[in-house]
C-alpha cells in the first residue's frame, strides 16, 4: 500500500506532496509515543484503558465501534492491499498464468506460514526483503539525482488539483490506527513496577522515532523516484505494468 501510494503521489504530482510525509511522520511519532507511555506506565494496552476509563454506555459502545473499525476493518483493508500488491507483481512476472489464482494462493500460503508457528522465519524473511527494497529505492534516488531545490519545495504545504485523495492515502498508509493498539500492548506486556519507567519511556521514544523516521525516508525515496521516472515525462500513467520505470536509473531497462 505504501509503495503504491507513494509511487502514485510522485508520478502524478511530482514532489508537491512531500510535506504530507513530514506531517504524517511527526503525527505517527507523537501518537505512538503516547500509546507507548500508556502501556509502560499503566500496564494496560489502549483497548484495556478505554474499557476501564469510559463508563457511559453510549460512549463505551462508540469506543468499541471505533476499536473494531481500527483493528478489524483496518487490518483487513491493509492485508487486502498487501495481497493485491503481491498479486500484481506476480502477474508481471508470469503474464501467461491466470491472474485470478494469485490472490487466493498467496492468502493460502500466508495462512499456512502463520499456522505453522514459524513466525521467526517469516519475520527474518520480511526483514531481508524490506532491507533490499529500501536499498534499491534509496540507491535509485541517489543515481537519479533529482534537483534538491525541487525536493525542498515539496515541504511547503500545497494541494495540487485532484490531490486530496492522494494526500489522505499518504496519511492513511503512515498513521496506522491498529499499530497504536499493538504498540501499547507490546509495551504493556513489558510493564514492571520495579523498572525505571522514565528510562523505559525515553528508550521507547528513541526507538519509535528512529524506526518511523527511517520509514519516512524510504517513502520519500519511493515518491521521489516515481517523480523522476513519470512526472513531466512521456512514460504515461503509472500502473502495475510500468511501475519499474522508476527504478531504471539503478536497474536499467
Where are these regions (language model features)?
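Juxtamembrane transmembrane-helix boundary signature
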Residues: 20-54, 67-74
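Extracellular/periplasmic helix-exit of transmembrane alpha-helices
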Residues: 29-41, 187-191, 195, 213-242
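Hydrophobic transmembrane alpha-helices that form the core helical bundles
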Residues: 61-95, 103
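Hydrophobic alpha-helical segments and their helix-loop junctions in multi-pass secondary transporters
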Residues: 130-156, 171-185
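Transmembrane alpha-helical segments of multi-pass small-molecule transport proteins
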Residues: 65-68, 93-115, 132-141
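Flexible loop linkers connecting adjacent transmembrane helices
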Residues: 6-8, 34-59, 88-90, 233-248
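Membrane-water interface regions at transmembrane-helix termini and the short interhelical loops
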Residues: 84-93, 106-128
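Transmembrane helix-boundary motif of multi-pass solute transporters/channels
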Residues: 1-24, 238-242
Amino acid at each position: 500500500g505504501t509503495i503504491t501510494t507513494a509511487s502514485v503521489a510522485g508520478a502524478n504530482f511530482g514532489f508537491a506532496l512531500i510535506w504530507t510525509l513530514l506531517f504524517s511522520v511527526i503525527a505517527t511519532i507523537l501518537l505512538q509515543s503516547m500509546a507507548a507511555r500508556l502501556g509502560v506506565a499503566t500496564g494496560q494496552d489502549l483497548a484495556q484503558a478505554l474499557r476501564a476509563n469510559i463508563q457511559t454506555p453510549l460512549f463505551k459502545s462508540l469506543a468499541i465501534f471505533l476499536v473494531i473499525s481500527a483493528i478489524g476493518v483496518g487490518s483487513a483493508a491493509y492485508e487486502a492491499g498487501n495481497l493485491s500488491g503481491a498479486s500484481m507483481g506476480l502477474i508481471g512476472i508470469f503474464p501467461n498464468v491466470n491472474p485470478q489464482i494469485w490472490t487466493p494462493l498467496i492468502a493460502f500460503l500466508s495462512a499456512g506460514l502463520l499456522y505453522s508457528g514459524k513466525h521467526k522465519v517469516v519475520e527474518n524473511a520480511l526483514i531481508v526483503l524490506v532491507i533490499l527494497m529500501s536499498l534499491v529505492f534509496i540507491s535509485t534516488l541517489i543515481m537519479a539525482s533529482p534537483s534538491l531545490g525541487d525536493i525542498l519545495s515539496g515541504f511547503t504545504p500545497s494541494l495540487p488539483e485532484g490531490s486530496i485523495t492522494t494526500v489522505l492515502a499518504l496519511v492513511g498508509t503512515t498513521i496506522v490506527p491498529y499499530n497504536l493498539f499493538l504498540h501499547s500492548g507490546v509495551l504493556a506486556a513489558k510493564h514492571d513496577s520495579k523498572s525505571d519507567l522514565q528510562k523505559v519511556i525515553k528508550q521507547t521514544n528513541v526507538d519509535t522515532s528512529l524506526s518511523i523516521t527511517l520509514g519516512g525516508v524510504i517513502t520519500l525515496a519511493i515518491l521521489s523516484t516515481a517523480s523522476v521516472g513519470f512526472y513531466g515525462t512521456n512514460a504515461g500513467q503509472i500502473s502495475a505494468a510500468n511501475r519499474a520505470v522508476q527504478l531504471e536509473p539503478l536497474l536499467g531497462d
